[in-house]
């Protein structure tokens, strides 16, 4: 019997795309990107597990993929909020916001 497996992937939710139920969110994927050739020098933001312990990352180094924004429906989300990144790491948030603005206004 064939089975479809699903892989859990972390996202950084940026904002609500709309306020109707079910809600859509604009989100940035968080990935380990093991193949260095697949990393974008500027728009894959490295986050070290030791520097950001409250994000509960599973990998020593993960990347917030600024240039890979996706729309995620709340029905596809199954985990609770891991961390309030705005409150925990405001400097990281400022950097992410600047890169988002730069990338999406210059395409």
Residue ranges and their predicted role:
Residues 3-8, 13-51:
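Compact nucleic-acid interaction/catalytic patches
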Residues 46-107:
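C-terminal terminal-subdomain/extension
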Residues 1-3, 62:
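Glycine-centered flexibility motif
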């Amino acid at each position: 019997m064939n089975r479809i497996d699903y892989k859990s992937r972390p996202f950084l939710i940026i904002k609500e795309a709309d306020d109707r139920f079910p809600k859509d969110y604009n989100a940035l994927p968080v990935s380990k990107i093991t193949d260095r050739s697949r990393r974008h020098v500027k728009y894959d933001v490295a986050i070290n597990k030791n520097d950001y312990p409250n994000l509960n990352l599973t990998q020593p180094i993960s990347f917030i993929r600024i240039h890979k924004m996706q729309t995620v429906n709340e029905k596809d989300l199954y985990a609770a909020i891991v961390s309030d990144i705005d409150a925990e790491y405001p400097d990281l948030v400022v950097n992410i916001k600047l890169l988002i603005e730069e990338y999406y206004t210059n395409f």
